[in-house]
Amino acid sequence: NIISCQFLSFETQNRRYANDEEWQKERDLERHKVQVIKQKMDACPLFISWGYGEAPINLEPYVNVESNGEKHKMAIMYVNNNYMDMFGLKLKEGRTWNDKDQFAQYKMMINETARKLFRIKDINEASLQTESRLWWSVGTDESKNPAYQVVGVIEDFRTGHLSMGDAPLAILYDEGENPTEPLMAKLAKGKRKEA
C-alpha cells in the first residue's frame, strides 16, 4: 500500500537564467514548495511514512563486483532506514544504517542472493570490490576505488518479474532527501479510499 507521484523536477537546475537574481528567486520558490510538501505530508493522517526515491522494482544487475576472485553483476540501490521500513525490507544479519553512516562511505548491505553468489560465510570479514566508483564527492581522492565493507544482509525480495528470480543486490546509504525524485508514501491502514 504505497503510492508514488512526481511533484518537483530538475527545472531550476537545467534551465538558463538571465541573471543571478532570477535564479535565486526560482531556487527560493522551489525551497518553499519543498517545505510546504513536507509540512502537509508530516501532518496528513492518511500516511504512516513518506520519502523520496524510486520504488525497488525493475532493478537490474548492472554493476560489476568482485570478491575472492569471483566477478558478478549486482543491482544497486541508494536508500535510508525510512525507505527500508516503508517497503518492509528485513534485516537478517548485521546492522542497518545508523547516525554515523553517510553518503560518501564504503559500506553496503547485501541481500541473501548476493551472499550466496559470493559465498560469504562471515559478513564481518566480507568486502566487495566494484569495478568502478559508485559515487563522487568533494574532497575524496577520485583515483582510488576501495572495496566496500559488508555491514548487513537483508532478506531477498522480488525486484523484477517473478520468473526472473532474485537479483543480487547491494544497498548503499542515501539520505533520501532529493525532492526531484518521486515522492512515495505508505498508506495508513484503512485509509486507501481517502488517499
Predicted regions and their residues:
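PAS and related sensory helical modules
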Residues: 93, 122-126
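Well-ordered beta-strand positions enriched in small/hydrophobic/aromatic, beta-favoring residues
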Residues: 3-5, 108, 128, 170-171, ...
